[in-house]
From Swiss-Prot:
It catalyses: RNA(n) + a ribonucleoside 5'-triphosphate = RNA(n+1) + diphosphate. This is DNA-directed RNA polymerase subunit beta'. Pfam families: RNA_pol_Rpb1_1 (PF04997), RNA_pol_Rpb1_2 (PF00623), RNA_pol_Rpb1_3 (PF04983), RNA_pol_Rpb1_4 (PF05000), RNA_pol_Rpb1_5 (PF04998). It comes from the Bacteria. Mg(2+) binds at D450, D452, D454. HAMAP family: RNApol_bact_RpoC. GO terms for biological process: DNA-templated transcription. It comes from Clostridium botulinum (strain Okra / Type B1).
């Protein structure tokens, strides 16, 4: 039985005229739409009820048959079938054309498919199709050539010269159709393959492109002459509706106008042909028909687009699919859903971490069907209808039922933009008064939400499965770690940090200092009776039973620390409990700041799991808010103390600057040096003022406390408040040498204020641009990696990928421990001195083991990596390693591709947009920040290219007046010389030994050069460390494996150089695994294998080169992708996420995987009874 949504693959192809007639329910003969008086569709028109079905349910056009009892009857008067009006969304019609026309996609696309298969230039083809030239179809005995073009004059002359029937020439799509009909694909294929063996250069490229099209037609069973259309399908009328506006006017879809033009011209052409009109008139009419059909299929592709009122181009069928507003992205990938609402958010500090406050009226509307069902169940309403009435009238008993319904029904909260998967989380709703959603303060970081008017959307998971997944996988209390680097995301911020910081401070000489208390409870009592200050250094006797023996100790602490430690588990490993005197010490015996809080949460999560951590977080939150209120930490101008030393420092610097100016005026130093020196001086002074300021601030100064605890603000901001603002940059990024000497406390003068606004304005403009760029980068990353899912446990590869720490200059950017933890080594790791095996191959390394390896002094380790994974689709769990979001091993079915794309894209907005200008005129600008990441992922030739050595050897430098040359001498004495342009900085010294692919000058390397010199492993390594450098320098941690996933997708295709005995075509791109498989088969038969080179594709190209045409078409260049796919008769295997979302199937990841869907649960009654008996005995 054929089920509509139960299929494994989807094929696309060209539609033959027979197929189009088969789809159709009748021919549309008239351009009329709806009768303006009766408002009923005209017969045989574009909205005809006989063809497309009735406008009203169960009612024919003339009204003879009304009601459902006549279902399926075709009215004998008007010929309309009595059925649902919904069929007008699926029934198609057709238009029989009086003359064939070409399909513009196949004629005009790049490369022109029609041109390639006919071996005619698109220009020549255009002349024929649009009736400007004749093409010779059959030269017979004449010296004319087949497919030769003749203009009107030449045609006349040829006829005069050779006689009327001596040759056949024609124009228009009919001529092209005849030519296409004559093509013998098998023969063409053989001939082209023969030609390919001997040809070179441009000719070879052309033959390869022709061969590709010929092979596509040959293998797919599409016929070339189907690229010329005899019949045009008319899409169902409800997909191109016509609606009446209030003024009696009609609003209609543009498609109706385009169809009308086609029908009008077609009917006129029929009439002219019947009348036997002169050739020139008929020809003109055919050309107009061709243009009308072009406009219908793809308006604006050729010539000027057809415009509607107000000079707006009409939206053609292609435009309906293309772009953000097209069918793919607007309706198939982003649908609006029912059971959803949105409202403003307010903070809910009293909530538990898994709760959110839902406004009553919103909850009632969202859970309406559930409430109605419950009302009937509880006997408060007799039937669903009366229950609905009760809900709509909001009768008092409804509220109790609503409470009951939502008690264990999670809801999903989402804040746009959803940059990573923590942008949607599940919560247990709590009904609140008012109309605002209440959000727990600790999930704000994940959502990037604040309460200045942000709005959030609520969605209700309906099915039991959806509710279970929401509760177990998406509950906010479970999402404590960031998927990008495995660090906690639910870290207390602002007031909570400030309260905890205040609580754990100590102060000398306050009330109660030095007192000794008998137990913690007594301390709290004394604090509540105001007998002891919260920061007083006191001693407390603690008692605890450990392993059956009671231990007593007196410890030194403060009341605040005792209060704070109540909410912290006392086994997080901050204190070495093996030492007897430490047995009862408080776990957190230090000043708590935002950073240390993150550490506490991380340790708690690793030790006790999510549930306990979320309970601890709630306690910290409550205490933090309470004590930041009690501490009454406020901010005032008197807290901003301008340091005494400032005036003196400024005067000294001004004197030195004057000295430098003098030297410049006397010509001792150049303009460049003067500028550099002045900048250096002022930078140092700003630092000195800042240090003087920090030294003069009291540790209980509120502003200092806020910055030091990490609650709000930073040292640099304090510096601006009370020190000096320092140097500013102008909009182009150059530093202005006049510093701002004032601080905000003293106030800026006019010039200083003006200079300040420069930078601020630039910052705002940058941010706006950056958001869009970052969003687009994320979209491309998602598209390139969306089908990477963990599909198997172990791919069984023996290969490994060698990792060492990543350095920039002398600074370690990513240490070895970070690159090793959560991975499997691909070979035994042996201690360099003792020779013992630290880790066996294929054993999981957690952070402790990774530390052990690093401490043993090992510098390079081979690990299992996504790069070397042999899974054909997706990756295997061993090569991927640890799931960063849970710090457990990854499960099969995890959509690691999407997670990777989100982890790289989400911090995109934090990266800078700047291009750094190096001093000096010819110095290359090094791109950094977001543009650099984009440049790497798109595998573009970078700005500021470095010169790279092609060979390994020793460096020899030669410098003449005209140029500098570096010569690399290889081991066998061969010399390769490189000319160095002036202004670029040389990285190597005389006598250095360098290897192939090393930089000679500073700058960025073209990744394609690295691929050529160092091979595919070299380029993978380069891309990985370069992207990491950009992110790490901005203080963003991303785990390597996310980058590996994307880079692997960029290096998956092989460009075929020689096809050997395989079916593969030279010059085409093919997946690495398909390539290996094809070669394996040929070798088994004893043939010659194909030869190919790995190609490095940018993410846009890689996303378009995917096997799935649905995914590619919904990404970019929709028409090109579909044209190509149709000719090849491509089959989409529906392996990725996007394709399945588009056709409305469950995604093949997580619980949507077949292995989870096909689990059978046995429920034999006997077994259940026995089981229950057993459990009772226990």
């Amino acid at each position: 039985m054929f089920e509509l949504n139960n299929f494994d693959a989807l094929q696309i192809g060209l539609a033959s005229p027979e197929k189009i007639r088969e789809w159709s329910r009748g021919e549309v003969k008239k351009p009329e739409t709806i009768n303006y008086r009766t408002l009923k569709p005209e017969r045989d028109g574009l909205f005809c009820e006989r063809i497309f079905g009735p406008m009203k349910d169960w009612e024919c056009h003339c009204g003879k048959y009304k009601r459902i009892r006549y279902k399926g009857i075709v009215c004998d008067r008007c010929g309309v079938e009595v059925t649902k009006a919904k069929v007008r969304r699926e029934r198609m019609g057709h238009i029989e054309l009086a003359a064939p026309v070409s399909h513009i996609w196949y004629f005009k696309g790049i490369p022109s498919r029609m041109g390639l298969i006919l071996d005619m230039s698109p220009r020549a083809l255009e002349k024929v199709l649009y009736f400007a030239s004749y093409v010779v179809l059959d030269p017979k005995e004449t010296p004319l050539l087949k497919k030769q073009l003749l203009n009107e004059k030449e045609y006349r002359e040829s006829i005069d010269k050779y006689g009327d029937d001596s040759f056949v020439a024609a124009m228009g799509a009919e001529a092209v159709k005849t030519l296409l009909d004559e093509i013998d694909l098998e023969q063409s294929s053989i001939e082209l393959k023969e030609e390919l063996k001997t040809s070179t250069g441009q000719k070879k490229i052309r033959i390869i492109r022709r061969l590709e099209v010929v092979e596509s037609f040959r293998k797919s069973g599409n016929r070339p002459d189907w690229m010329v259309i005899d019949v045009i399908p008319v899409i169902p009328p409800d997909l191109r509706p016509m609606v009446q506006l209030d003024g009696g006017r009609f609003a209609t879809s543009d498609l109706n106008d385009l169809y009308r033009r086609v029908i009008n011209r077609n009917n006129r052409l029929k009439k002219l042909l019947d009348l036997g009109a002169p050739d020139i008139i008929v020809r003109n009419e055919k050309r107009m028909l061709q243009e009308a059909v072009d406009a219908l299929i793809d308006n604006g592709r050729r010539g000027r687009p057809v415009t509607g009122p107000g000079n707006r181009p009409l939206k053609s069928l292609s435009d309906m699919l293309k772009g953000k507003q097209g069918r793919f992205r607007q309706n198939l990938l982003g649908k609006r859903v029912d059971y959803s609402g949105r409202s403003v958010i307010v903070v809910g500090p009293e909530l538990k971490m898994y709760q959110c406050g839902l406004p009553k009226e919103m909850a009632l509307e969202l859970f309406k069907p559930f409430v109605m069902k419950k009302l009937v169940q509880n006997g408060l309403a007799h039937n669903i209808k009366s229950a609905k009435r009760m809900v709509e009238r909001v009768q008092p008993q409804v509220w109790d039922v609503l409470e009951e319904v939502i008690s264990d029904h999670p809801v999903l909260l989402n804040r746009a933009p959803t940059l990573h998967r923590l942008g949607i989380q599940a919560f247990q709703p709590v009904l609140v008064e008012g109309r605002a959603i209440k959000l727990h303060p600790l999930v704000c970081t994940a959502y990037n939400a604040d309460f200045d008017g942000d709005q959030m959307a609520v969605h209700v998971p309906l099915s039991v499965e959806a509710q279970a997944e929401a509760r177990f996988l998406m509950l906010a209390a479970h999402n404590i770690l960031k998927p990008s680097d495995g660090k906690p995301v639910s870290v207390p911020t602002q007031d909570m940090v400030l309260g905890s910081y205040y609580l754990t401070m100590d102060k000398d000489g306050v009330k109660g200092e030095g007192k000794v208390f008998s137990c913690p409870e007594e301390v709290l009592m004394a604090y509540q009776c105001k007998a002891v200050d919260i920061h007083a250094k006191i001693k407390v006797r603690l008692k605890k039973v450990i392993d059956g023996e009671t231990i007593e100790r007196i410890i030194e602490t403060t009341p605040g620390k005792i209060i704070f430690n109540e909410s912290i588990p006392q086994d997080l490993g901050y204190i070495d409990r093996t030492v007897p005197e430490n047995k009862l010490k408080l776990e957190v015996d230090f000043l708590v700041s935002k950073k240390t809080l993150g550490g506490i949460i991380n340790r708690c999560y690793m030790k006790h799991g999510a549930t306990k951590t979320s309970i601890m977080l709630d306690k910290i939150k409550a205490k933090g808010y309470h004590y930041s209120t009690i501490g009454a930490i406020t901010i005032s101008t008197s807290d901003m103390v301008v340091p005494e030393a400032k005036r003196e420092l400024l005067q000294n610097t001004e004197k030195q600057v004057e000295k430098i100016q003098k030297m410049y005026r006397r010509g001792f130093i150049s303009e460049e040096e003067r500028y550099e020196k002045v900048i250096d001086l002022w930078t140092k002074t700003t630092e000195d003022v800042a240090n003087a300021l920090m030294g003069s601030l009291d540790s209980f100064n509120p502003i200092y406390m806020m910055a030091d605890s990490g609650a709000r603000g930073s040292k640099s901001q304090i510096k601006q408040l009370a020190g000096m603002r320092g140097l500013m940059a102008n909009p182009s990024g150059k530093i202005i040498e006049l510093p701002i000497k004032a601080s905000f406390r003293e106030g800026l003068d006019v010039l200083e204020y003006f200079i300040s606004t420069h930078g601020a304005r630039k910052g705002n403009a940058d941010t706006a641009l950056k958001t869009a760029d970052s969003g687009y980068l994320t979209r491309r990353l998602v598209d390139v990696s969306q089908d990477v899912i963990v599909r198997q446990e172990d791919c069984g590869t023996e290969e490994g990928y060698e990792v060492s720490e990543i350095k920039e200059g002398n600074e370690v950017i990513e240490p070895l421990v970070e690159r090793l933890s959560g991975r499997y080594p691909s070979e035994d790791i042996i201690h360099p001195t003792t020779g013992e095996v630290i880790v066996k191959r294929n054993t999981y390394m957690n952070e402790d083991i990774a530390k052990k390896v690093s401490d043993a002094g090992i510098k390079k380790v081979k690990i299992r990596s996504v790069f070397t994974c042999k899974s054909k689709h997706g990756v295997c769990a061993r090569c991927y390693g640890m799931n960063m979001a849970t710090s457990q091993k990854i499960h099969i079915g995890e959509a690691v591709g999407i997670v990777a794309a989100q982890s790289i894209g989400e911090p995109g907005t934090q990266l800078t947009m700047r291009t750094f200008h190096t001093g000096g005129v010819a110095g290359a600008d090094i791109t950094q920040g977001l543009p650099r990441v984009e440049e790497l992922f798109e595998a573009r030739k970078p700005k500021g290219l470095a010169i790279v050595s092609e060979v390994s050897g020793t460096v020899k430098m030669e410098e003449t007046k005209k140029k500098r040359t570096i010569i690399v001498v290889t081991d066998d004495g061969e010399e390769v010389s490189y000319d160095i342009p002036f202004g670029s900085r040389i990285k190597v010294k005389n006598g250095d030994i360098i290897s192939a692919g090393d930089e000679i000058t500073e700058g960025s390397i073209n990744p394609h050069d690295i691929l050529r010199i160092k091979g595919v492993d070299g380029v993978k390594n380069y891309l990985l460390s370069e992207v990491q450098k950009v992110y790490r320098l901005q203080g963003v941690d991303i785990n390597d494996k996310h980058l590996e996933v994307v880079i692997r997708q960029m290096t998956r295709k092989i460009k075929i150089e020689d096809s050997g005995d395989t079916e593969l075509l030279p010059g085409t791109m093919i997946d690495v695994f398909d390539f290996e498989e094809a070669n394996r088969e040929i070798l088994e038969k004893g043939g010659e294998p194909a030869v190919g080179r790995i190609a490095l594709l940018g993410i846009t190209k890689a996303a378009l080169a995917t096997d799935s045409f649905l995914s590619a078409a919904s990404f970019q260049e929709t028409t090109r992708v579909l044209t190509d796919a149709a000719i090849k008769g491509k089959i989409d295997p529906l392996l990725g996420l996007k394709e399945n979302v588009i056709i409305g199937k469950l995604i093949p990841a997580g619980t949507g995987m077949t292995r989870y869907r096909s689990i059978q649960i046995n429920t034999d009654d006997e077994n259940i009874e026995e089981d229950s008996m057993d459990s009772i005995e226990v």
